[in-house]
Curated annotation (Swiss-Prot):
InterPro entries: Cyt_b6/f_cplx_su6. It is found in: Plastid, Chloroplast thylakoid membrane. The gene is petL. This is Cytochrome b6-f complex subunit 6. The lineage of its organism: Eukaryota, Haptista, Haptophyta, Prymnesiophyceae, Isochrysidales. Belongs to the PetL family.
């Protein structure tokens, strides 16, 4: 059970990191 929670946390962390990088690069390009 704890392994599943850890996996979900890891996936959400990776997704948020990728989204942050993507939007960060887009905002830098717009400026």
């Amino acid at each position: 059970m704890s392994a599943l929670i850890g996996y979900i946390l890891l996936m959400t962390l990776m997704f948020s990191l990728a989204a942050g990088l993507y939007f960060g690069l887009r905002s830098i390009r717009l400026i």
